[in-house]
């Protein structure tokens, strides 16, 4: 075999053509072909990453979150929000077809395959940021509302836990008898339409954008997200939120509201939990209020010593104790897959996008609720 002495010569390049062809070495070697359109996607992804870092929060908040993104939200919901088929199925089908075509092009060489693969990643990254991801650059809800976590101490958390406990007792007492049975706790039908108006009203109360009709789907199979310690996820490339079908009915109101808040452009996890709490608290539906109160109580309980929580649980009405038991039993059906890896990766992702607390940001909701109620202690807010 003749050795390759240098990398030479022939370069045909035009962004109006499908491919760029390099001839490497002698004429006996196969030309290296690069997929041109993939270079465009790669460049767009790099540009998105750069401008995300260099432009200030005031820009993203005004021009993207309250401007460009609102237009995207309205257009998407008008065109695709009424589809009975979750967009995740359609997007995954497109990815599978594109992957099959990519494998079928292996005869064009490794340069081509790698350029196509990187182009695919670039397309997903670009769509992520331009369709939603730039919301990570917005001014945080905590800053909008003037919250300061340093102003909340241990005694405040204890008082908030007691308040959340009292609310849970009250909401459970207000349930109709048929909603206190196991079949309701586990299998009552709860869908995104049941929460949308509550979420929009909560956002309006906070003077935040709320146009559009965000969908939150419950795709098959049960447990797919729960096995990754995740109850729900918003996927920007689909324009829709998703919750695990394996969740109990009592867990769904808060989780749907959380993912719907993401769909309206809120990126911070603690802020989405706060909006979910507010939406459920002010709902006219007793099941939504009860489900929201239970989920929020669990967040508050996570901030307390075990003995304090254990002592409280035994004083709850039967429906609350039964709901807590059923949730724990349901969690055991879906054991975590690589929990440490998942936590490390996701926490790193959140911090990379400006969420300083990482996974701990979810529990910021307790501090946010405590400070919100203190600022609005005139009785006009939900207790």
Predicted regions and their residues:
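Auxiliary, metal-adjacent structural segments of Zn-dependent hydrolase domains
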Residues: 176-245, 249
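Post-HExxH zinc-binding segment in Zn-dependent metallohydrolases
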Residues: 164, 267-310
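Membrane-interface segments at or immediately adjacent to transmembrane helices
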Residues: 134-204
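Membrane-embedded alpha-helical segments of integral membrane proteins
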Residues: 46-104
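Pan-zinc metallopeptidase signature
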Residues: 319-383
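Active-site recognition of the HExxH zinc-binding catalytic motif
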Residues: 84, 254-266, 270-273, 277
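Transmembrane alpha-helices and immediately adjacent membrane-cytoplasm interface residues
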Residues: 92, 98-101, 111-143
């Amino acid at each position: 075999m003749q050795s390759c002495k240098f990398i030479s010569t022939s370069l045909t390049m035009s962004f109006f053509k499908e491919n760029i062809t390099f001839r490497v070495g002698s004429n006996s070697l196969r030309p290296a072909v690069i997929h041109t359109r993939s270079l465009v996607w790669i460049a767009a992804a790099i540009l998105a990453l750069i401008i995300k870092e260099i432009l200030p929060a005031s820009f993203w908040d005004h021009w993207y979150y309250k401007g460009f993104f609102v237009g995207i939200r309205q257009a998407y919901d008008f065109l695709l929000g009424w589809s009975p088929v979750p967009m995740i199925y359609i997007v995954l089908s497109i990815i599978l077809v594109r992957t099959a075509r990519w494998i079928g092009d292996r005869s064009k060489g490794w340069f081509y395959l790698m350029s196509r693969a990187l182009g695919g990643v670039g397309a997903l990254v670009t769509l992520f940021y331009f369709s939603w991801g730039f919301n990570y650059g917005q001014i945080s809800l905590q800053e909008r509302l003037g919250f300061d976590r340093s102003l909340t101490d241990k005694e405040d958390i204890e008082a908030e836990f007691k308040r959340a406990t009292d609310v849970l007792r009250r909401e459970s007492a207000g349930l109709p008898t048929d909603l206190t049975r196991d079949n309701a706790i586990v299998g009552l039908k709860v869908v995104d339409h049941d929460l949308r108006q509550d979420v929009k009203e909560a956002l309006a109360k906070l003077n935040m954008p709320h146009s559009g009709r965000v969908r939150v789907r419950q795709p098959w199979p049960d447990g797919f997200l729960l096995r990754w310690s995740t109850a729900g996820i918003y996927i920007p490339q689909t324009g829709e939120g998703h919750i695990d079908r394996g969740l109990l009915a009592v867990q769904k109101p808060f989780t749907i509201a959380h993912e719907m808040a993401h769909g309206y452009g809120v990126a911070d996890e603690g802020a989405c939990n706060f909006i979910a709490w507010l939406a459920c608290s002010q709902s006219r539906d007793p099941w939504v209020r009860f489900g929201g109160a239970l989920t929020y109580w669990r967040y508050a309980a996570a901030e307390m010593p075990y003995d304090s929580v254990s002592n409280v649980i035994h004083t709850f009405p039967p429906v609350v104790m039964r709901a807590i038991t059923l949730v724990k039993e349901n969690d055991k059906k879906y054991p975590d897959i690589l929990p440490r890896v998942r936590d490390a990766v996701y926490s790193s992702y959140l911090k990379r996008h400006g969420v300083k607390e990482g996974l701990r940001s979810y529990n910021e909701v307790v501090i946010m609720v405590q400070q919100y109620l203190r600022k609005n202690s005139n009785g006009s807010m939900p207790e």
